[in-house]
């Protein structure tokens, strides 16, 4: 599809489309089907060259593939991105220099040197870690050396650096750490099992057996002494893995987040055997087998609420777990549905409202974020009734939650605009729709400072490498015009970095000097451009249209 004066698919025909029939403003669209619909409306009266049914109804290959995902190579001089292969479901990876020149498809052994999206950087900005094909890699940014930390059929995820160079990552609910020169070691293990060292429940018969039969008593004392000695050796030996932490048999581990220094673990659990409700079954009649098949869908609305969560703070060295109660959250006992319950003649709510620690938007892990120095942690707690969202910290010394922000809405808390994290100096930043629009706030322990304001939205905030500037997506001109914007962490004017009229997403270069932008328009599938972080004209890197 050409943006202006080119080939446009129109109601089953292909021909140049008059610009006066086109919408006057660009629209942010990620769906080519939606673009085709708009084009059909604009050009329905024009008909010359027939289009095949495949082109008109489904397959956008004839238009050209959109850039689906893009990231920086380690040196900041090249970008890597994925394109759909024509006529197939395969996604190929290409590499292109930003200084000019064509793209090269990376195939075969060349793929072993690929970088990956969502890389995380150490405090000195000399190394980055990322996950590729489920394995963890570390790249030295001084010379490009790539070190593979894991090579397994399991999926590792969520790497994070500590301020002193320790890297932690997870494999399911097991946590590992890596430090240069020491290799990979297990950092924390939590099990939903009975602690073998825990005393059994009181039982008169058992007590009489031990009191009357000296052999049984001696055997028990021998076992206990051997176990205690082994645990003492484990704690004193730095080459040993940490002992498991046992949460008991009444819970199921749903998620967890380890502090970068490996000392603390936050664990999210649900009740074992809890009824999630029967899921709906969607019948599929056109199948390879020739027989009808059923696909499991979500639990039907109104059947069962999402399972409530419990939260535990684990001292990894001591293998001790303490439940963090939610009763310190303001409004947790208030029932926003009290009037409806009364009208329906239902019993009033008793105790605290059920809550969940929801996953991050990208599905990478729970909405729990540690600061790089492991001194601070924040988590997003959401009421199951969707009327409240809290961002809470944890008092690690006293094992209790401390509320940092509360957002309440009688209608519904948005599933989006819930990003949060920490600045370089340990202040909490977060998005909130308290004003009616998503805006950026910073809280350093007192009253929150609002960095952005107006009848527009902030999304996907990212800190610059020096920690001085937030970059984010904004739509200040009108709701459909998305750009990359920036604002100082200390406060100040918001500036627009791009003028592309349709930013989909962006990524800062490793040194923070440039921004890789994926953008589209009504008649152009997502493409890549690069712009200086200080602003200026964008340099377009790709044009995948035919």
Q: For each of these PLM feature ranges, what is it?
A:
Residues 31-42:
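Bacterial N-terminal signal peptides
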Residues 312, 540-546:
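N-terminal cap/lid segment of alpha/beta-hydrolase-fold proteins
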Residues 528, 538-541:
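Blade-level signature of beta-propeller repeat domains, shared across WD40, Kelch, NHL, RCC1
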Residues 45-505, 513-514, 520-526, 531:
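Beta-propeller folds
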Residues 2, 18, 25-28:
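Basic polycationic patches enriched in arginine
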């Amino acid at each position: 599809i050409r943006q202006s004066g080119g080939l446009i698919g129109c109601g089953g025909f292909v021909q140049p489309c008059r610009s006066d029939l086109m919408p006057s403003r660009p629209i942010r669209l990620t769906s080519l089907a939606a673009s085709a619909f708009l084009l059909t409306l604009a050009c329905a009266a024009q008909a010359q060259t027939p289009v095949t049914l495949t082109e008109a109804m489904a397959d956008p290959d004839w238009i050209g593939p959109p850039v689906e995902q893009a990231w920086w190579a380690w040196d900041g001089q090249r970008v890597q991105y994925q394109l759909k292969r024509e006529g197939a479901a395969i996604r190929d990876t290409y590499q292109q220099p930003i200084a000019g020149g064509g793209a090269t498809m990376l195939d075969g052994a060349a793929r072993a040197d690929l970088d990956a999206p969502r890389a995380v950087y150490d405090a000195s900005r000399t190394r980055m870690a990322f996950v590729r094909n489920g394995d963890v890699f570390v790249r030295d940014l001084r010379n490009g050396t790539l070190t593979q930390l894991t090579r397994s059929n399991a999926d590792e995820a969520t790497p994070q650096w500590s301020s002193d160079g320790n890297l932690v990552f997870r494999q399911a609910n097991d946590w590992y750490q890596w430090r240069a020169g020491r290799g990979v070691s297990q950092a924390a293990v939590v099990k939903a099992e009975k602690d073998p060292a825990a005393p059994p429940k009181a039982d008169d018969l058992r007590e009489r057996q031990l009191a009357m039969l000296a052999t049984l008593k001696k055997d028990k004392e021998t076992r206990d002494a051997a176990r205690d000695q082994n645990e003492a050796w484990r704690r004193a030996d730095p080459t040993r893995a940490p002992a498991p932490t046992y949460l008991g048999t009444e819970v199921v581990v749903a998620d967890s987040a380890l502090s970068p220094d490996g000392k603390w673990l936050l664990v999210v659990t649900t009740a074992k055997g809890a009824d999630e409700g029967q899921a709906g079954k969607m019948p599929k009649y056109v199948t390879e087998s020739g027989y009808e098949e059923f696909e499991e869908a979500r639990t039907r609305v109104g059947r069962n609420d999402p399972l409530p969560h419990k939260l535990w703070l684990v001292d990894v060295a001591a293998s001790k777990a303490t439940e963090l109660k939610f009763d310190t959250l303001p409004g947790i006992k208030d029932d926003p549905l009290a009037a409806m319950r009364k009208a329906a003649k239902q019993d009033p709510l008793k105790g605290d409202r059920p809550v969940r620690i929801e996953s991050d938007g990208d599905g990478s892990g729970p909405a729990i974020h540690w600061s790089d120095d492991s001194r601070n942690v924040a988590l997003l707690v959401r009421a199951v009734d969707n009327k409240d969202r809290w961002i809470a910290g944890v008092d690690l010394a006293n094992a209790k939650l401390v509320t940092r922000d509360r957002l309440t809405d009688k209608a519904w808390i948005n599933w989006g605009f819930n990003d949060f994290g920490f600045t370089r100096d340990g202040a909490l930043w977060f998005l909130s729709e308290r004003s009616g629009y998503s805006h950026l706030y910073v809280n350093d322990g007192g009253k929150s400072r609002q960095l952005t304001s107006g009848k527009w939205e902030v999304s996907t905030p990212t800190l610059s490498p020096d920690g001085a500037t937030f970059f984010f997506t904004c739509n200040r001109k009108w709701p459909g015009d998305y750009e990359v914007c920036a604002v100082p962490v200390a406060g100040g004017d918001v500036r627009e970095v791009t003028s592309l009229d349709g930013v989909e997403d962006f990524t800062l270069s490793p040194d923070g000097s440039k921004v890789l932008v994926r953008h589209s328009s009504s008649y152009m599938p997502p493409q890549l451009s690069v712009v200086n972080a200080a602003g200026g004209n964008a340099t377009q890197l790709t044009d995948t249209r035919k």
